[in-house]
Swiss-Prot record:
InterPro entries in the cross-refs: P1/P2_N_sf (IPR038716), Ribosomal_P1/P2 (IPR027534)
GO cellular component terms given for this protein: cytoplasm; cytosolic large ribosomal subunit; cytosolic ribosome; synapse
Coiled coil regions in record: none
Compositionally biased residues, Low complexity: 69-88
Name of this protein: Large ribosomal subunit protein P1
One Pfam family named in its UniProt record: Ribosomal_60s
Length: 114
């Protein structure tokens, strides 16, 4: 979980981005000081450097666009490639999802007191 210092810097950077102002250490410090939050001195510089060459708008839009989940187990040493082992696991997941969706379609929630 993020600390208060990290959250203050994050919110400051988002405010600056929303106002279409360049994110700098001084501007982050100014917002944090105006909010009355005590922050360790390295946080604003760290966030300013991290966000210097980043398109914050695209970063916000792509937050939930992660890759596929890793396979359930690791392949044993000298075993088949992970992609070959992951294919049956993916088929099982798809079948399980289909079964769950069929069950949810059948049960409309009318049996609350059964």
């Amino acid at each position: 979980m993020a600390s208060v210092s990290e959250l203050a810097c994050i919110y400051s950077a988002l405010i600056l981005h929303d106002d279409e102002v360049t994110v700098t250490e001084d501007k982050i410090n100014a917002l944090i000081k105006a909010a009355g939050v005590n922050v360790e001195p390295f946080w604003p510089g760290l966030f300013a450097k991290a966000l210097a060459n980043v398109n914050i708008g695209s970063l916000i839009c792509n937050v939930g666009a992660g890759g596929p989940a890793p396979a359930a187990g690791a392949a044993p040493a000298g075993g088949p490639a992970p992609s070959a082992a992951a294919a049956p696991a993916e088929e099982k997941k798809v079948e399980a999802k289909k079964e769950e969706s069929e069950e949810s379609e059948d049960d409309m929630g009318f049996g609350l007191f059964d």
